[in-house]
Amino acid sequence: MAKSKNHTTHNQSRKWHRNGIKKPRSQRYESLKGVDPKFLRNMRFAKKHNKKGLRKMQTNNAKAMSARAEAVKALVKPKEVKPKIPKGVSRKLDRLAYIAHPKLGKRARARIAKGLRLCRPKAKAKAKDQTKAQAAAPASIPAQAPKGAQATTKATE
């Protein structure tokens, strides 16, 4: 038969939480550092025996709250309040992923291409612009060769 352990962990957390896990005494009244400890101790007893001294507890609480408010006011410096601008969710990445998708993005890509085609200047307008540019250019400058043709004259060294 297996030997039982001396220390058990069974039911421990329930035991700890039954009375509430308490902070160390030094950290208990962090915001009430300016208040004397005797007063705080009395306040705790008044809380425990609230049937005996309900009025006392209420006065103590009021005193403690005012003392706490003063302590907090002394500790915290007022900050400038900045207006909060609501930030919307960025859907940029979702949109890009949708466009890049092989099936889903087919129509989206078609629409984008159509929009780009519509934005491009028309062929007639291009021809008019080119004729105006050629007429305005002086005759000394030779006309540009077509894209595929090579230049016949080379600079001699």
Curated annotation (Swiss-Prot):
Q: Which Gene Ontology cellular component terms are annotated?
A: cytosolic large ribosomal subunit
**Compositionally biased region (Basic residues):** 1-26
Task: Give GO terms: molecular function aspect only.
Answer: structural constituent of ribosome
- Look up keyword Ribosomal protein and say if it applies: yes
Question: What InterPro entries does this protein's entry cite?
Answer: Ribosomal_eL29 (IPR002673)
Listed under GO biological process in this entry are:
cytoplasmic translation
- Which positions carry N6-methyllysine? K5
Q: Where is the composition biased (Low complexity)?
A: 132-147
Give its localization.
Answer: Cytoplasm
Claim: Phosphoprotein is one of the keywords in the record: yes
Q: What is its main location?
A: cytoplasm
Q: Which parts of the sequence carry N6-acetyllysine?
A: K33
Q: Where in this protein does the record put region Disordered?
A: 1-32, 121-157
Which residues are recorded with the post-translational modification Phosphoserine? S31, S140
UniProt keyword terms in alphabetical order = Acetylation, Cytoplasm, Methylation, Phosphoprotein, Repeat, Ribonucleoprotein, Ribosomal protein
PANTHER family per the UniProt record, alphabetical: 60S RIBOSOMAL PROTEIN L29 (PTHR12884:SF18)
Summary of subunit composition and partner proteins: Component of the large ribosomal subunit.
Q: Which family does it belong to?
A: Belongs to the eukaryotic ribosomal protein eL29 family.
The UniProt function text for this chain reads:
Component of the large ribosomal subunit. The ribosome is a large ribonucleoprotein complex responsible for the synthesis of proteins in the cell.
Name of this chain's protein: Large ribosomal subunit protein eL29
Origin organism is Macaca fascicularis
At the highest ranks, the source species' classification is: Eukaryota, Metazoa, Chordata, Craniata, Vertebrata
